[in-house]
């Protein structure tokens, strides 16, 4: 397990270098969606991507070539880290990438720091949350996913809501309460259009 972690940390240096070498347009225009379970990342990614390139990180069929290596890892978080690094460092064109809830959150401080470095060059990392109030977000997601309070899924999602990782990675936070997935997608598009206009004026 220790060797496996060291292997991932070593691989992350190559991921970071390969991401640095990606065309600037890919890093500037791609959209990464992060957030707890039940925030609609996949649905919103499909709307944003339209007919463009969408990469769903928790879709085992879509990424079956990468998921085929899952059994080689004793620690699933090391596999998730490697999956994220591989996908981000090999992007061929502007994409909409929806992370699974755990892909952006790591209890291991070294992996967490390396994830920050891997994501640092991407301009549009959108954290989706129901509400700015963490407890309200928890209650909304419990009802939305029909999850029992205190269950393992609830505990996992509470960790995803409260852990600092997502807040540190995000370039923007979108609160979804009272909005449809289409509303959220349009808000993201408007946000990025305005951001692009401001950058052009500089």
Predicted regions located by residue number:
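NTP-dependent small-molecule kinase module
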Residues: 2-26, 47, 51, 124, ...
